[in-house]
Amino acid sequence: MNKTPPETRTGEIAASPARFLGRGDAAVFDTFVVPQYLALFAERLLELIVPTEDARVCHLQCRTGYPDRDLLARLPNAHVYGCDNSEFAIELARAKAKTIAGFVHDYRVIEAFTTPFPPGAFSHGITLHPLAAPAERRRMLEELARIVAPRGQALVAMPLRGSFIEIADLLRECALKNELTELTNAVEAAVQLRPTDELFKRELEEVGFEFVDVDVRTRTLRFENGRQLFEDPATRLMLLPEFRVNLHMPDDAPFAYVREAIDKYWSDGAFELTVNVGVVTGRRKSA
């Protein structure tokens, strides 16, 4: 596992290896991860955005700026402010934004969720695929509550509980066969980190939003074999780093078991990975 670079060590969330995106990674992320994986979360989020004239949108954890181009189709003339911990992702987001005629944008590098914006500055606040850890979600939702204006809209899309259950099952099998009690406990704890739809709804309500609803749609990712799964850019840049953090896994031996098991059990067909795509939306309560 790559050592976390010094520039990402400020603040607990920013220091997570699951948040790091280097220069080369940012380009791969935008070229492959966005259309093949992140689009699963953006497509429904965009449909649920409430149109507003002269919208001001804050995109927390914006990475390389997706889906800000598509956002303009839903919110013409919107001003978009994107924030992320990766300077390389922000660099690419800025370059892409300059190719869109008339697009008013401001992309900034931030630490954790500390945005420089005043309270109530935005009509909309959005986030795609935040980390599963409850502390991460809480800080992100609290920041959305701070910067979204009364009656403004927040939208957050992420994998809900039950996502990636096939990998969890194979890790459980690995733990059972090798009598790894710590791994069994780690898998069970990691599975519980992701919210259910009811918990997701309650969390947004608790920070000051009303008319909250959660849209859930099940999608599948198909892989021909274990190698394709583990070499896929979405797995490498998004899923595995977070799995390692959530499982507190000291080495990758259990993942090697998963890869071999996929090749064994699914030798005659594709391996399908479940993703429960959840989008929570709500309106900021009036003061």
Predicted regions and their residues:
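Class I SAM-dependent methyltransferase SAM/SAH-binding core
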Residues: 56-115, 139
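Conserved catalytic/acceptor-binding region of the Class I
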Residues: 138, 151-224
